[in-house]
């Protein structure tokens, strides 16, 4: 699990700035940007065959340290929900890339890894009981998440309520990159398309509905003015209830 997650995190490092890291005491020579990462040769060729396993463990520990630093930084910069009603303006669901991203946004992976670390500190018995699948837990509404492009969205609604055109490509110093949006919406083919799961239909009318949040994207308004604006995209699937009358 840890190695798989580290592999996904490595693919993101080329698209983001490195977060401040504390110095790590890692053995070996030639370490540069990241402690424990070498620019030439393999772990076995430098310190012998037995050094490979030690180096792999050290590398895993180093990346765990980096991830913990990123989680700490995220907690510091994330606005308080009690003092900021526009907290979902800061969701990280937009990526500029030359190809379709293969994984969810990095912050989603960090949250999953944080939950994994919390579970790792539990006893085996507590861990089994904390696993939602073992407890038979199911989502109230079935949802799907996927990356979409501006070619799929075409237009969107900005914070002023106006309709703007979402630009498919963003100019950069070495060419152009496509805008990708990570959207979450209710699954039309799921088991909850006729109502929320676990709701007493004798007393309640229920419906799974897709809700939206604001993210920043490069757009063009009706006056052909191009700029970065906050637009609404699908970000979750929630259950809405209304009580049945006349019963």
Swiss-Prot record:
Residues bearing carbohydrate: 121
Q: Pfam families from the entry? A: NGF
GO MF terms listed in the record are: growth factor activity; nerve growth factor receptor binding
Entry comment on modification after translation: Mature BDNF is produced by proteolytic removal of the propeptide, catalyzed by a FURIN family member. In addition, the precursor form is proteolytically cleaved within the propeptide, but this is not an obligatory intermediate for the production of mature BDNF. Can be converted into mature BDNF by plasmin (PLG).
Spell out the GO cellular component terms annotated for this protein, sorted alphabetically and separated by semicolons.
Answer: axon; dendrite; extracellular space; synaptic vesicle
Q: Which GO terms describe its biological process?
A: cell surface receptor protein tyrosine kinase signaling pathway; modulation of chemical synaptic transmission; negative regulation of neuron apoptotic process; nerve development; nerve growth factor signaling pathway; neuron projection morphogenesis
Domain of life assignment: Eukaryota
Give the positions of the site Cleavage.
Answer: 57-58
Which keywords are on file for this protein? Cleavage on pair of basic residues, Disulfide bond, Glycoprotein, Growth factor, Secreted, Signal
Enumerate the PANTHER family for this protein: BRAIN-DERIVED NEUROTROPHIC FACTOR, NERVE GROWTH FACTOR NGF -RELATED
On subunit structure and binding partners, the annotation says: Monomers and homodimers. Binds to NTRK2/TRKB. Can form heterodimers with other neurotrophin family members, such as NTF3 and NTF4 (in vitro), but the physiological relevance of this is not clear. BDNF precursor form: interacts with the heterodimer formed by NGFR and SORCS2. Mature BDNF has much lower affinity for the heterodimer formed by NGFR and SORCS2.
Protein name (record): Neurotrophic factor BDNF precursor form
Per the UniProt record, the source organism is Ursus arctos
């Amino acid at each position: 699990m840890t190695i798989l997650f580290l592999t996904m995190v490595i693919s993101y490092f080329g698209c983001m700035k490195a977060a401040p890291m504390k110095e790590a005491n890692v053995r070996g020579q030639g370490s540069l940007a990241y402690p424990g990462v070498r620019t030439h040769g393999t772990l076995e060729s430098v310190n012998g065959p037995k050094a490979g396993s030690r180096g792999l463990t050290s590398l895993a520990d180093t990346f765990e340290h980096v991830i913990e630093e990123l989680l700490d930084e995220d907690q510091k910069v994330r606005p308080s929900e009690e003092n900021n009603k526009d907290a979902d303006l800061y969701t990280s669901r937009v990526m500029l890339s030359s190809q379709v991203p293969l994984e969810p946004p990095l912050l989603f992976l960090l949250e999953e890894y944080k939950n994994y670390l919390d579970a790792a500190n539990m006893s085996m018995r507590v861990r089994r009981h904390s696993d939602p699948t073992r407890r038979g837990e199911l989502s109230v509404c079935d949802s799907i998440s996927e990356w979409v492009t501006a070619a799929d969205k075409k237009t969107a609604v900005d914070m002023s309520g106006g309709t703007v055109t979402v630009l498919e490509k963003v100019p950069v110093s070495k060419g152009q990159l496509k805008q990708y949006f990570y959207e979450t919406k209710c699954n039309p083919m799921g088991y909850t398309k006729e109502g929320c799961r676990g709701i007493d239909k004798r007393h309640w009318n229920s419906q799974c509905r897709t809700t939206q949040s604001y993210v920043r994207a490069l757009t063009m308004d009706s006056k052909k003015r191009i700029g970065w604006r906050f637009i609404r995209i699908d970000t979750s699937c929630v259950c809405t209830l209304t009580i049945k009358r006349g019963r």
